[in-house]
Amino acid sequence: MNEKYDPAAIESAAHAQWVAADAYRVDENARDSQGQLKPKFYACSMLPYPSGKLHMGHVRNYTINDMLTRQLRMKGMNVLMPMGWDAFGLPAENAALKNSVPPEKWTRENIATMKGQMLAMGLAIDWSREVATCDPTYYKWNQWLFLKMLEAGIAERRTQVVNWDPVDQTVLANEQVIDGRGWRSGALVEKREIPGYYLNIVKYADELLGAVANPEDPNYLSGWPERVRLMQENWIGKSEGVRFAFPHQIAGADGELIQGGKLYVFTTRADTIMGVTFCAVAPEHPLAAHAAATNPALAAFIAECAHGGTTEAELATQEKKGLPTGLFVTHPLTGAQVEVWVGNYVLMSYGDGAVMGVPAHDERDFAFAKKYGISIRQVVQAEGQTFSLDGWADWYGDKQRAVCVNSGLLDGLPYKEAVSKVAELVGAQGLGEKKTTWRLRDWGISRQRYWGTPIPIIHCDDCGSVPVPEKDLPVVLPIDCVPDGSGNPLKKRTDFLNVACPCCGKPAQRETDTMDTFVDSSWYFMRYCDARNSEQMVAGGTDYWMPMDQYIGGIEHAILHLLYARFWTKVMRDLGLVKVNEPFTKLLTQGMVLNHIYSRRTDKGGIEYFWPHEVENVFDAGGKVTGAKLKSDGSAVDYGGIGTMSKSKNNGVDPQDLINQYGADTARLFVMFASPPEQTLEWNDAGVEGAHRFLKRVWGFGVKQAELLKGATEVGAELSGDAKALRREVHLVLRQVSYDYERMQYNTVVSGSMKLLNALEAYKHDGSAGSAAVLREGYSVLLRGLYPACPHITHHLWSELGYAAKLGDLLDAPWPEVVEAALVQDEIELVLQVNGKTRGSIKVPAAADKAAIEAAAAASAEVAKFADGKPIRKLIVVPGRLVNVVV
């Protein structure tokens, strides 16, 4: 063996051996040495977007997965760790626009680069199952299932209000609208109502909610972080209340009553119905449009609202504005006339696009009424409180403590009883009923983008929107388009666009919208189970592997991706494609990787960021960083604290640079040791150096003791006291490390390995066979415990030192068992105190009773020394810990 630890040579040789053996390919028929089927375990990281290069967040995520996979394989399980590419999406279009290349080319090059980096990391990935969502063989099944959803009524075509960029001629996501303007063009964004396809996720809302909110639910996701369950519960947002109508006699231009003469609202606070002093409708509401036809000021206001946000989050932060319409509706219980306003805070997509205004008991309505001089009427009262129009108080909206007042038939009723009474009263008039609503909205999947799954629909003037026949799937996306910023290039591709109608044969056109990329990531984990099946979307492999046992990914995916994947699984179940109710049994959301941020203002008012290696920190007297200066010229820069690694802030670390300098094992070891997986990891160059030094020590011990380790026998009964002590330490560490693997607390797995190496290095070999045997056993435990984190160096040492000859390749070597007999001590050491102060220690037989311990303490030299001739008054024994001699 080479005395010097050479990561590049070691890792290259290990890779070659694993590739030649196809070491990570798994199937559904794996059996143990007795011919029994191995239990399965499916561990998967969220598939990455092929952005160009891996970042340290990727390294951390995949190393967590790899450690889990390798250790469970050693424990005899059939473990699947697949990988793929979330390859469609807007970033590829933007890169293509910038570089004048097709997104396909940019994407494939990035996949090749990132796959090479993953190989260099030594990940135990079954690459035979690799998928890329931009492959027609993959997205064919997006299209196929979409057609099945159409047949089942789960998918349907309807209109939607979207953010429209009039310059780029495309729909923008809400996060792409900055201060009302398109993020790229700078144009004022418009709200437009355009047709698109929606998936009825709300149909599954109760089931989706139960598994995250109700521990009694048979599908309750107890293996998920509570934080994620709560985020999904809030996003689904179940509300129970009353939907009722304000009748009116407002007729449209056609002479018919608008919306049948009923303005419907939904409220969870029907107990406050007697406090209604106005109603507000969305700018797109039919009553708003009717009033605006003869009111130029209102028409201008509605046009202004068209440049606002389209989400609840945006509306919550913007200034609340409104204008009266001059229209009135009738209060369903009092018969009073209630004025209708147009409010910029009302969403047409939420409920009926209208809300009742109760300023006395809703904080938003209170501010709106004060701003516009609308009357405020108190209708609930909490005991001991005083209502005032001067300002809002939290109790005004408290439904738990208050009872109805100034409300006629409702007076004195608490919240629940009042709501039931209102539902009864409006129901008797045929104007309403109790209803459950959801914050969750049906999933609009249409995107006016090129780089995505084509929606398999053909539009015919005679036949309407016609599904593409299954035999013609996939509808293949042209891969040579180069976006030029003038809208969806598919609209210009006549070879794609023009097609015969499947029904009548007349000229027709394909749908040019593509699917939301969340569609791609909603079922890829099932495709891994049967990735090469050209005849079926999923088959037997899915029955074997699903549900996934462990899913690993960032908290940023807690809502949309995970919710959509759960929904997609339930749809596939209902269509008879899979048998599971929930896709992911356990979820780990790993923490972000953080690093220091340094910057300063430029002469032009911009911000210039500096790499951490370019600066030197300035500390205060307490050792706290107060600033920094450039190493090159000593000029001051601002220290921005710790933040997420980012290319834009020059505080990222290129994993490839780390691998080139230290090797993949060092990179893996550091990201596992520096922090528990679910917590943030603060980057530390000194920590990387420390991890590398530790691996050099592991290597050095193996080299130094090579001959002894190769020639040692199995541990027998004849061991010296020191050998027994070392063996006990080995098995204590093994017990703790095994437990830490079960908990996925990989940082303490590494610290346990460090503790074990310290013990092995400190041990003085006495030349006996027993001593050598304990060293050999201890080092084998070290290599196996460390192997999932650092597979290359441990693989090499395992083979070179003869372990593989007896126990097989480290990939499938058995996980070591704790020998309980080794934990039994012949002798124990107790802390010795005199009058409560520690003065030394004593050793006594492990089986010593209280009298024997007291005798040993009384006879010790330390007691004689510190008692100073005084007689012993009392001895206090704390079993297994200490003895206190009171003089």
Swiss-Prot record:
Cellular component terms (Gene Ontology): cytosol
Pfam families, A to Z: Anticodon_1, tRNA-synt_1, tRNA-synt_1_2
Gene3D superfamilies reported in the protein's UniProt record: 2.20.28.290, 3.10.20.590, HUPs, Isoleucyl-tRNA Synthetase, Domain 1, Valyl/Leucyl/Isoleucyl-tRNA synthetase, editing domain
Motif range ('HIGH' region): 48-58
UniProt binding sites for ATP: K647
EC numbers on record: 6.1.1.4
Catalytic activity field: tRNA(Leu) + L-leucine + ATP = L-leucyl-tRNA(Leu) + AMP + diphosphate
Record keyword DNA-binding present: no
Signal peptide stretch: none
NCBIfam families per the UniProt record, alphabetical: leuS_bact
Name of the molecule in the record: Leucine--tRNA ligase
Organism whose genome encodes this protein: Leptothrix cholodnii (strain ATCC 51168 / LMG 8142 / SP-6)
Gene responsible for this protein: leuS
